[in-house]
Curated annotation (Swiss-Prot):
Catalysed conversion reaction: RNA(n) + a ribonucleoside 5'-triphosphate = RNA(n+1) + diphosphate
Record InterPro entries: DNA-dir_RpoC_beta_prime, DNA-dir_RpoC_beta_prime_bact, RNA_pol_asu, RNA_pol_N, RNA_pol_Rpb1_1, RNA_pol_Rpb1_3, RNA_pol_Rpb1_3_sf, RNA_pol_Rpb1_4
Gene Ontology terms for molecular function: DNA binding; DNA-directed RNA polymerase activity; magnesium ion binding; zinc ion binding
Name this protein carries in UniProt: DNA-directed RNA polymerase subunit beta'
Assembly, per entry: The RNAP catalytic core consists of 2 alpha, 1 beta, 1 beta' and 1 omega subunit. When a sigma factor is associated with the core the holoenzyme is formed, which can initiate transcription.
Cofactor binding, note field: Binds 1 Mg(2+) ion per subunit.
EC code: 2.7.7.6
Organism of origin: Staphylococcus haemolyticus (strain JCSC1435)
GO biological process per UniProt: DNA-templated transcription
Binding site residues for Mg(2+): D449, D451, D453
Residues annotated for Zn(2+) 1 binding in this entry: C60, C62, C75, C78
HAMAP family, alphabetized: RNApol_bact_RpoC
Domain of life of the native organism: Bacteria
Assigned protein family: Belongs to the RNA polymerase beta' chain family.
Length: 1206
């Protein structure tokens, strides 16, 4: 028996008739399924127990042998073997066909493999196979050509002339004879000769034929096996028949399709035995062919066979295809045991690493563990007794349950799982009720809210799984977002508002200027109601024992507020005292200006000092995020998660105390709003007058009106924000970053402004009312356009974004960190990414966390800042940019030489941990999720750049899809294919512009549409591949003109442009990994003396291997050019057929793989999931498969790590 979990590759091929018979346990001769009275399977039928095995465990059909003791006996009465009924899932049967039948995949697929091999058109093949024409197999003396077609009349004519001297056949038999006669070696030789001379259409056909012939020759498949003599029947449990309540039966469609085949086959046998007339036999053979076609792929040819209610029957091919097919439904994702699902509720008192599990759910999930413990503690006598105790929910069960779940992490998952933070591990605590309690800080990562969201719980069972969950997936470990390395667990809403309120200062607060000895005094005074949170006070600096305070500062009084003293309690001791929301205070020291020498104070003391000082800004959401990032950088993850918990508690506590609410009175309408509106109304009238006089065009008028009203809204917004009290609840909410922004407030109290029509064009009639005043009917109607479009957009966007993520994951799933250093000698030159003058991504962000490829010296001091292959940390990156260096070479995934993945050095640091990336990290999947997850935040709209002349710029999600699918973009830019000077720009016919570029050896002219904006002028010198007009470049063309490196950088820049414009930050390395996957194939131009086929797509590594061999043997190498594939195409072109088949176009991929006899080396993640092995990433990598752990004598503390013994 082969070990199911330990094989190295999987191979697929065509099955010979002998092979099919060897799989089979007997021939199915009757179309019957089960007897309607006894409900037992019919003998020799589709469910026959003699062929497929018994329906009941250890019991033969007639009941003579029952029980395990007769294991392996074959009953002498009914012929059924006594064994487990499970064999009915694996035993196959077969049908001996009375006439050969063609397999529809090989005859009908595009391109038709059978047609290419025989050099016949698919049309001709169809005529022969479906008995419309004869094919000449052996022409004899007739002068006919071999493989030519004859109609019935022509065949009669020749048959009368040359009786018995030539052979022409109909149906699959004729094709089978032709296939058997093919000599692959001779075909190969003649085709290789033809390649030398042929051109155009003949050349492409020859290349296609050569590919098929080569496939058959290399794989050892016999071409005649594309014609079936024997049909396999899949095991009955996979096409079950079940009884419904009303005594009727529900059956799998396959049984109907098999039944048709058997009926027709039996009828054909009988007709042949009777020696029926040829025309009747022919008709029956054709019907048999059609029945087999329907079984294999119903609906591929002609009308599909339908069942009751005109529903097409699901054939074998449909069982594999699509979301409901075998691959995606059962192999890539399975339902698992030990899982539960419930609504989530907030758990504000939980620690970062905890979640609350409902008691009933926990009991059911941990049932086996509890049962074992009950028996071990002798609370229950045996397992059965333990089970009944649990079902009765006896009191002693709960104590045991608490011990069982202690330190046994569970996984919580929220659908849709867009990135790896959608599944995290927590330690469960038991809670009453039926809702799962979730820690408020992890909601951002899950994108969860508590309006009825549900989450699933999974229990990791094995010790290894528990260890992985605890070490890698615990929520307290996942503080950084893998897409940009920024903290993802920032406080939000109430927590932000609470901390904002806590750090506010007020001028009129009670007892301002009181000086306290230490923190405890402050807290007591606050508890006793002597001071308010917002009271500005002084505290002796020495009492803080803060290591960042200087000697001089320690002897002074620190001017701060009660709230800030409380806030600073939660921050690690060695941190500076945070007194103002500034980066300097955060990174280094508390500014000197807050330390006051008590001797210098005048008569009014500290109170008088405070009255002169401006109030300090409170801490908003962004600043809280910066604090978290800083603490994370300087301290351990544990410290950070502890501080986060404290920050959360403070936030909730003080937002409750603040009692901030919104009332209608908080929305104050601007008194002089009408004046602003009247003023702008006059401007609009003036523009209309100019238009009526013909001074400006319709476009100019429209743009001017839109601009006037936008300005009006901006002016109202500005004045509103000015007139707002700092303590206005709405202002506090928006200023702190808890909820809302200035624009929302303007709509409530100012004016709603301009709205967009369904087409996306802005309606020039503004909504001058605010929600506080109420809208008129017309205004309300206009504003519904936008609102409804928003909802429709969101729904569409979610589906689109999910599909994009799926394609990205599929193309990059086999990119894993495979080695430490690939030793490449190339690097990527990086600098600022700019669009015109606008900064898209600064240089410093591009180099941080990457490895250098060159030595960088300070231009003035000549001091070495960094050497090659060293990690550029945040400090070094700052040094490099401070030295005025604007570009450098770094290690990049683009230039990595590692096969099937990247190396540690070319990837850089792991953004999710901030540490060096480890071998085994599945960086491809992380990259795909990082790009796909923010997809839902991108817009769907196409921006219209004013008027008729403006071209549409595709942005947001459609643009990302356009880039990754390598499609021709909308609004395409014209690029120059030569280096030279722009000689002339003139008008050509059809209002087009002609740009003439003069190079050293040739002059080329390019046509651009009359409305496109030019980016060059006469006399300007241009590089090869430079853009002449505005717009997006077509990447495939650009690759041919500008080369590989320029194309990679261009695609990277374009992706970053879209995301950064929407305010989404994604690290370059993720885009690099994806773009590299799109460029991993080359197209062979000339094969030289290698075995490669001209015109074929091969992996870049296979190409270099073949050439290396050729060089060794002093032969001519092959030449090739790089090819840019869209992600869908790249996924289908992957080396692994299992991965490609489970993605899209399942039948095409499998047909191709079977003919080529492909082997899948199971290198990616998907292939291993499909066959049920551990994925070759992380601890599942082959290099870690035989690691053993020693058991420590003494308990291991958290800081030590268990020693690993090879």
């Amino acid at each position: 028996m082969i070990d199911v979990n330990n094989f190295h590759y999987m191979k697929i091929g065509l099955a010979s008739p002998e092979k099919i018979r060897s799989w089979s346990y007997g021939e199915v001769k009757k179309p019957e399924t089960i007897n309607y009275r006894t409900l037992k399977p019919e003998k020799d039928g589709l469910f026959c127990e003699r062929i497929f095995g018994p329906t009941k465990d250890w019991e033969c059909s007639c009941g003579k042998y029952k029980r395990v003791r007769y294991k392996g006996m074959v009953c002498d009465r009914c012929g059924v073997e006594v064994t487990k009924s499970k064999v009915r899932r694996e035993r196959m049967g077969h049908i001996e066909l009375a006439a050969p039948v063609s397999h529809i995949w090989y005859f009908k697929g595009i391109p038709s493999r059978m047609g290419l091999l025989l050099d016949m058109s698919p049309r001709a093949l169809e005529e022969v196979i479906y008995f419309a024409s004869y094919v000449v197999v052996d022409p004899g003396p007739t002068g006919l050509e071999k493989k030519s077609l004859l109609s019935e009349a022509e065949f009669r004519e020749y048959y009368d002339k040359y009786p018995g001297q030539f052979v022409a056949k109909m149906g699959a038999e004729g094709i089978k004879d032709l296939l058997e006669e093919i000599n692959l070696d001779e075909e190969l030789k003649s085709l290789r000769d033809e390649l030398e001379s042929a051109t155009g259409q003949r050349l492409t056909r020859a290349i296609k034929r050569l590919e098929v012939v080569e496939s058959f020759r290399n794989s050892g498949n016999n071409p005649a096996w594309m014609i079936l003599d024997v049909l396999p029947i899949i095991p009955p449990e996979i096409r079950p028949m079940v009884q419904l309540d009303g005594g009727r039966f529900a059956t799998s469609d396959l049984n109907d399709l098999y039944r048709r085949v058997i009926n027709r086959n039996n009828r054909l046998k009988r007709l042949l035995d009777l020696g029926a007339p040829g025309i009747i036999v022919q008709n029956e053979k054709r019907m048999l062919q059609e029945a087999v076609d329907a079984l294999i792929d119903n609906g591929r040819r002609g009308r599909p066979v339908t069942g009751p209610g005109n529903r097409p029957l699901k054939s074998l091919s449909h069982m594999l295809k699509g979301k409901q097919g075998r691959f995606r439904q059962n192999l890539l994702g399975k339902r698992v045991d030990y899982s539960g699902r419930s609504v989530i509720a907030v758990g504000p008192s939980l620690k970062m690493y905890q979640c609350g599990l409902p008691k009933e759910m926990a009991l059911e999930l941990f049932k086996p563990f509890v049962m074992k413990e009950l028996v071990q503690r002798e609370i229950a006598t045996n397992i059965k007794n333990a089970k009944s105790k649990i079902e009765r929910m006896d009191d002693e069960v709960w104590d045991v349950l608490e011990d069982v779940i202690r330190e046994h992490p569970v996984l919580l998952n929220r659908a849709p799982t867009l990135h790896r933070l959608g599944i995290q591990a927590f330690e469960p605590t038991l809670v009453e009720g039926r809702a799962i309690r979730l820690h408020p800080l992890v909601t951002t990562a899950y994108n969860a809210d508590f309006d009825g969201d549900q989450m699933a719980v999974h229990v990791p069972l094995s010790k290894e799984a528990q260890a992985e969950a605890r070490m890698l997936m615990l929520a307290a470990q996942n503080i950084l977002n893998p897409k940009d390395g920024k903290p993802v667990v920032t406080p939000s809403q109430d927590m932000v508002l609470g901390n904002y309120y806590l750090t506010l200062e007020r001028k009129d607060a009670m007892n301002t200027g009181t000086i306290f000895n230490d923190t405890n005094e402050v807290l007591k005074a606050y508890a006793n109601g002597y001071v308010h949170l917002h009271t500005r006070i002084g505290v002796h600096a020495k009492s803080f024992n803060n290591p960042t305070f200087t000697e001089a500062q320690n002897n002074k009084i620190l001017a701060t507020s009660v709230g800030k003293v409380i806030f600073n309690e939660i921050i690690p001791d060695s941190f500076a005292f945070i007194n103002e929301p500034s980066q300097t205070n955060l990174e280094g020291k508390t500014p000197d200006k807050y330390f006051i020498d008590s001797t210098q104070l005048g008569e009014g003391g500290l109170k008088a000092y405070f009255e002169e000082q401006e109030l300090i800004e409170p801490f908003n959401k962004k600043f809280l995020g910066n604090i978290i990032a800083e603490v994370f950088n300087r301290f351990s993850i544990t410290d950070t998660s502890m501080m986060l918990d404290r920050m959360k508690d403070l936030g909730f506590k003080f937002s409750s105390k603040a009692g901030i609410t919104v009332g209608v009175a908080d929305i104050v309408v601007l008194p002089d709003k009408q004046d602003i509106l009247d003023e702008h109304e006059k401007l609009v009238e003036r523009v209309s007058k100019q238009f009526n006089r013909g001074l400006i065009t319709e476009d100019e008028r429209y743009n001017a009106v839109v601009e006037i009203w936008t300005d009006a809204k901006d002016q109202i917004q500005g004045e509103l924000m000015q007139s707002l009290e700092k303590t206005n609840p709405i202002f506090m909410m928006s200023d702190s970053g808890a909820r809302g922004n200035a624009s929302n407030f303007t709509q409530l109290a100012g004016m709603r402004g301009l709205m967009a029509a369904p087409s996306g064009k802005i309606i020039e009639l503004p909504i001058t009312s605010s929600f506080r005043e109420g809208l008129t009917v017309l205004e309300y109607f206009i504003s519904t356009h936008g609102a409804r479009k928003g909802l429709a957009d969101t729904a569409l966007k979610t589906a689109d974004s999910g599909y994009l993520t799926r394609r990205l994951v599929d193309v990059a799933q086999d990119v894993i960190v495979r080695e430490e250093d690939c030793g490449t000698d190339r690097g990527l030159l990086v600098s600022d990414i700019k669009e015109g003058t606008e900064m898209i991504e600064p240089f410093i962000e591009r180099i941080e966390g990457r490895y250098s490829k060159e030595t960088i010296r300070h231009p003035e001091t000549d001091e070495i800042i960094i050497r090659p292959d060293e990690l550029i940390t945040a400090e070094i990156a700052k040094k490099i940019t401070d030295a005025g260096i604007e570009q450098m070479y770094i290690r990049s995934a683009f230039t990595c030489n590692t096969r099937h993945g990247v190396c540690e050095k070319c990837y850089g640091k792991n953004l999710a941990t901030g540490e060096k990336v480890e071998v085994g990290e599945a960086v491809g999947t992380i990259a795909a999720q990082s790009i796909g997850e923010p997809g839902t935040q991108l817009t769907m709209r196409t921006f219209h750049t004013g008027g008729v002349a403006g071209s549409d710029i595709t942005q947001g999600l459609p643009r990302i899809q356009e880039i990754f699918e390598a499609r021709n973009p909308k609004g395409q830019a014209v690029i120059t294919e030569i280096e030279g000077v722009v000689e002339d720009i003139k008008l050509a016919k059809d209002r087009q512009q002609e740009i003439v570029v003069k190079g050293a050896n040739e002059t080329r002219s390019y046509l651009a549409s009359g409305t496109s904006r030019l980016k060059v002028e006469v006399g300007q010198s241009v590089e090869r591949g430079e853009v002449l007009t505005e717009g997006s470049i077509e990447p495939k063309n650009f690759l041919a003109v500008a080369g590989l490196n320029a194309t990679e950088s261009y695609l990277l820049k374009e992706v970053q442009k879209v995301y950064r414009m929407q305010g989404v930050e994604i690290d370059d390395k993720h885009v690099e990994v994806m773009v590299r996957q799109m460029l991993r194939k080359v197209r062979i131009i000339e094969a030289g003396d290698t075995k490669l086929l001209p015109g074929s797509l091969v992996d870049i590594h296979s190409f270099t291997d073949a050439n290396r061999e050729a060089f060794k043997e002093r032969k001519r190498p092959a030449t090739a050019k790089p090819v840019l594939l869209g992600i869908t195409k790249a996924s289908l072109e992957t080396e692994s057929f299992l991965s490609a088949a489970s993605f899209q176009e399942t039948t095409r991929v499998l047909t191709d793989a079977a003919i080529k006899g492909k082997r899948d080396d199971l290198l990616g993640l998907k292939e291993n999931v499909i066959i049920g092995k551990l994925i070759p990433a992380g601890t599942g990598m082959r290099r870690y498969s035989d690691v053993k752990y020693d058991k420590a004598e003494t308990p291991v503390t958290e800081t030590e790590e268990a020693e690993i013994i090879e």
